[in-house]
Amino acid sequence: MFLLTFILPRYGDEYVYSFVFKTEKRTKNIIDIIYSTYNMYMNWSGRIIPNFLQNLFLLFGKFPYSVVNALIFVTIIKQSLSLLEKYTKKIKISNFDYIILFFLNWFLIPVFTQDYIGLASSVSYSWTLCFLILYMNYLESIFSREKVPNKIIIYSFLIGLTNEVIIIFINIFLLFKILQYKKINYKILLSLWIGSAIEIFSPGNFARKFSPETQRNITTLFERYSQFFKMVHTMIILKILIFLLLLFIIKYYLYEKKKKYIPLDMIITSGITLVLMIIIMPRNEPRAYLAPFYFFILSIFYFLKLLYTDNRYFLYFSKFSMGIMLFISLCNIIPYYFLTVRRLDNERQKMTKYYIENNLKEVVFYENDSILNKMDSSHRAYEMLFLYPEVFTNSYFSKYYGFYKVYAIPRGSKLFIIEFEMGSRLDKIEINLDQGNKNSINSFQIDNMSLLTIPEEVKEIEIKGEGFKIKKIKIIEIYKGITLDINNDIRKIGLN
């Protein structure tokens, strides 16, 4: 975990959190981080604790974050097994159980890289999951007491300041505890509800919900549920969980007539949380579903644990099959991260350094998505730069390094930009490359500007059509910057 975290390049969100939110100032000290967290609370997100920690660890740097993130992951696994021990009273945890729970997470979490490795999303989801599991462990040990320690009240309040999925999950889970113990601790509930209200009703949550960017990306409830159930990992988790639950009931309740603990509290809470999250989210967001998915997986582990504990042949088979699957997976993952991802990141850093040293302000980088997507969706790294320079990732990357504009283009191409006069009709434009012998690779049009990526070897460009007037033409190339800049209505261009 440490090595994967350390090697993974920065994502776009991490450049956003490198600045005091809503300002042009880079975060440099704890005062900047507090002010940035306040700005985010008022303008973007009520997740006070994750927002603060994201800013803080970006200030600390990659190495401290990688160490803490690896420890967080280990804590999640360790405390999850401890939680099961508290619930069942009889289950005995072995060293092999740690491997099994890691194995299940590695293969079943829909977006492992985003949830457990990338800084911004990992702090938002896996770190808050860790806080939740620690809280549930502590809650289980003190809930039946007549008098609870004051620190659980503080802890309950802080849990409310994490994120929406944790808030929904723990509130539903507490209802199960109340029904189980037939007692209500109003101090715990009140402190949790106060923290939850501060998070949920933050001005930033409402500002984000009604922002133009969010409104553009909203999908219908039907589309969100459809996308959710189309995710391969969703169906695999649900099928395995249902199969093992039925097998467990048949074996212990129907055949052996034994009553054993069934984690219905975790399963039902996770299911309700998922239903509510899909309703409130503007679009399908797999990384936000980590907590309920994790407790589904923990339930799967529990069923497997009891089944293979009573069957040594199943235990041997599990060890052998998991070892083979992990070996094959790591044989793909290790070269991908240590060779491909690292090479692409070093290449981009080299380009960035070159552009800065040569004072180039409007520049192009390689768009590497076609290379990065050769890994499965759960473990892949992601491209953060795109053709359109106003995408927030391009915009913050530009601001971070002091560029004017940043574009991303396919390898073997250069960027051709046409800016038209206002009022131009752009529906009848025809662009011929080398007298029609070559085609543009991809294009993007916004307002009165067209962005085209064209092959590097193109020698002649001809712009045909009527009803428009060209204001400016540019060509930008890798390592060269702007190689052509014409401020005339010219229709035919010869290139060297």
How would you label these PLM feature ranges?
Residues 149-151, 193, 306-331:
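Signature aromatic-anchored transmembrane alpha helix within multi-pass, membrane-resident enzymes
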Residues 73-84, 129-143, 171-179, 242-250, ...:
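Transmembrane alpha-helical segments
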Residues 1-44, 58-76, 84-94, 322-496:
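Intrinsically disordered, polar/acidic, low-complexity terminal segments
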Residues 95-140, 163, 236-241, 273-303:
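Membrane-interface micro-motifs in multi-pass membrane enzymes
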Residues 264-274, 294-298, 320-327:
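Hydrophobic membrane-spanning alpha-helices of multi-pass integral membrane proteins
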Residues 5-67, 119, 154-272, 279-288:
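Transmembrane catalytic cores of multi-pass membrane glycosyltransferases
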